[in-house]
Amino acid sequence: MSARNLVTPDDLGRRVSFQFELPNGFQSEVVGVLESYDAAADTYFVRTKEDRLQRVPGRGIRFGKVVS
């Protein structure tokens, strides 16, 4: 399965969903508001409903989309 990320830095402030692979090989998923994007590190930062800031490495993303 090829990666498909439909989220861009222009989506800041919108609700997003990511499925991604962690550096240790495990899979993870996060849903929340896209707070920032670090271009140098190719990393998205998503604020969850638990008010936790989740780092999402761009190169590990399997699927990303904007949700309602």
Short names for language-model regions:
Residues M1-S68:
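Conserved RNA-binding domains used in RNP assembly and mRNA/RNA metabolism
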